Amino acid sequence: MHEIITLESLCQALADGEIAAAELRERALDTEARLARLNCFIREGDAVSQFGEADHAMKGTPLWGMPVSFKDNICVRGLPLTAGTRGMSGFVSDQDAAIVSQLRALGAVVAGKNNMHELSFGVTSINPHWGTVGNPVAPGYCAGGSSGGSAAAVASGIVPLSVGTDTGGSIRIPAAFCGITGFRPTTGRWSTAGIIPVSHTKDCVGLLTRTAGDAGFLYGLLSGKQQSFPLSRTAPCRIGLPVSMWSDLDGEVERACVNALSLLRKTGFEFIEIDDADIVELNQTLTFTVPLYEFFADLAQSLLSLGWKHGIHHIFAQVDDANVKGIINHHLGEGAIKPAHYLSSLQNGELLKRKMDELFARHNIELLGYPTVPCRVPHLDHADRPEFFSQAIRNTDLASNAMLPSITIPVGPEGRLPVGLSFDALRGRDALLLSRVSAIEQVLGFVRKVLPHTT
């Protein structure tokens, strides 16, 4: 069998019978068993029984037989739903989230539920109950979070794609740390129905894939049209570099990202430095206020709609992560955010969106570009520091607050710690973003050429 380079070509190989869906399933299960130390999945039961099989009645659909995993805050009918927390252990969903239904309709097979940071409230996926997610490409280092199990499952070759959620960077941070692609679409692009929330304002369903091209292919299918983005059809463009996002970088992160820009300049991409001081100040008023105010009511309403009968305090009483427990206790007590403060932050969010529109127009740019995470991937021994959360989301949270589509791609050199480079576009310009960044990744050439489990 020839090398399968892209998700689209893997789909074609399945459709043509070059590889059998059952064989792809067995390879995924074998890889998961061999790499069990990574704790990519939350399995309440054996993996074989929880890994779906291709429905031959669906043959001919675009993703027929394709294994896809889901972060464990996403409802999958008949599978456990834990949101990564001990207090929900044993709860089984009786419904599919909207995104699961969409992917099933396209022929995808549910591979299982991915481990995550407890209740999505962190960026390390160090989970005291379900186990720490390992980093497949940097053993001993943090996999990122909160969609860490999803990123690790893709990076290790267990599955070619996974679905996660992103509130302030929870898809893009682990993607960057694990050396893959993470895509957060324009907020609201895909329904969050059937997902255990953090914040209805900021939460977003997104994709973890090997490449931006794969993300673009999936985006097209989920949008109702099959499309790919060949380099020859995509001209270089003008990209803004926000000053704040390029400041105070780890040396290794800076070198990798600057080197990537240098390669792109040689092929005609234009970069302009942007003073974003007023944007930074406005953005900081939303970062924690909005999600921490919305979390408690959103979680309670979501659990009620899913048939949870024990109340949220049953869950909070069993939280294992000390940082998560501290955040919850503080904001249920003296740190509770006042309604007036929350409403003011929402108004700032509307202003931020207008300012981003103005910034793109004023500088005549199509994209923003910046290092996904300003610090290097931390060793697990040093990752669980309370201050690391703010450091990790420093750059990613702007897209979340301004509701921009955002994508990270790997730019770290082989043999070194992974580094991610992110790009944002204006709201609603997801296809443009994916087209441009698919071209960028082909210029940079930092993509591993073969899906590990398909050769």
UniProtKB/Swiss-Prot annotation:
E.C. number: 3.5.1.-
Gene3D superfamilies documented for this protein: Amidase signature (AS) domain (3.90.1300.10)
Gene Ontology annotations of biological process type: auxin biosynthetic process
InterPro entries (UniProt xref): Amidase, Amidase_CS, Amidase_dom, AS_sf
Pfam families: Amidase
Active site, per annotation: 71 (charge relay system), 146 (charge relay system), 170 (acyl-ester intermediate)
Record keywords, A-Z: Auxin biosynthesis, Hydrolase, Plasmid
Known pathway: Plant hormone metabolism; auxin biosynthesis
Taxonomy, superkingdom: Bacteria
GO MF, one example: hydrolase activity
Function of the molecule: Hydrolyzes indole-3-acetamide (IAM) into indole-3-acetic acid (IAA).
Family: Belongs to the amidase family.
Record protein name field: Indoleacetamide hydrolase
Organism the protein comes from: Pseudomonas savastanoi
Lineage: Bacteria, Pseudomonadati, Pseudomonadota, Gammaproteobacteria, Pseudomonadales
